[in-house]
Design a protein with these regions (language model features):
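Negatively charged
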Residues: 1-215
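Non-catalytic beta-sheet/beta-sandwich ligand-binding modules that flank or precede catalytic cores
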Residues: 214-250
């Protein structure tokens, strides 16, 4: 089997443990557990985390995979007794968890660098609406998502729109992002009639600097006082930089 596209789409009551499946040759999981209609999906792998052991190394698209699946919340990142999904070949994450209102797992271990900017199609899809209306999502409360390699991303429009995302993403390197409308809007509750309220954007301090890569250089001063010398009103400090530095005389 090389495609599982729309396999359980609109199978609203399906909820069995299929974590033992061999998915190593599958290239498309597009809309696999998508609601596909007005009703929401209830798939949660029978309550088992085994789905986190799937071999997804060949998958190229997870477009709309869990769209409208209001029950799914199993670990898909490494740790927690599962190996975690290998998504390094995935080029499209668009709307993967859109409307997956319970999903809140730590997927910071994912290698998402497979997205590309050399194709209009891949670029337009990319991470667009990946977690849109996934109201519980905050990467399981972990800041590990800050380690995602986003250099290939060019569309993050509504990526975290109406979520609980409050992790610091300011370290993301996003030199190619061209579409970022409503990137992250934090969800804080509903009125009695179900209308969304109290929506606030992710703070500027936690938002990536669009079109740029932040400097990751750090400076560590020695803790050995013998390395720090004061002579004739001059202070000599011994320091270590995390990156190669080219000294510039002043």
């Amino acid at each position: 089997v090389t495609t599982m596209e729309s396999m359980f789409e609109a199978a609203y009551a399906f909820d069995q443990n299929i974590g033992s499946w061999d998915t190593s040759n599958v290239t498309s999981m597009e809309e696999m557990f998508s609601k596909g209609g007005s009703n929401n999906m209830s798939f949660n792998n029978g309550g088992s985390p085994d789905i986190g052991n799937w071999d997804t190394s060949s998958v190229r698209t997870m477009y709309f995979m869990f769209n409208g699946n209001t029950e799914f919340d199993q670990p898909l990142g490494s740790g927690g007794g599962v190996s975690g999904w290998d998504v390094s070949s995935v080029k499209v994450f668009e709307s993967m968890f859109q409307g997956a209102s319970k999903f809140n797992q730590d997927i910071g271990s994912w290698d998402v660098s497979g997205t590309q900017t050399n194709s209009d199609y891949w670029c337009a899809a990319g991470f667009r609406k990946m977690f849109d209306y996934a109201i519980a999502f905050n990467n399981g409360g972990s800041d590990s998502i800050k380690n995602w390699d986003m250099t290939g991303a060019c569309n993050v429009e509504q990526m975290f729109h109406i979520t609980s995302m409050n992790q610091d993403l300011s370290t993301w390197c996003v030199p190619n992002v061209t579409s970022k409308n409503s990137f992250a809007t934090i969800y804080n509750g509903v009125h009695g009639n179900g209308n969304l309220r109290d929506r606030t954007p992710l703070s500027d301090a936690k938002t990536p600097v669009w079109g740029k890569c932040p400097s990751i250089a750090t400076l560590v001063l020695t803790s050995d006082d013998s390395d720090n010398i004061i002579t004739t009103s001059q202070v000599t400090l011994t320091a270590t930089f995390s990156l190669s530095m080219s000294p510039t005389p002043t």
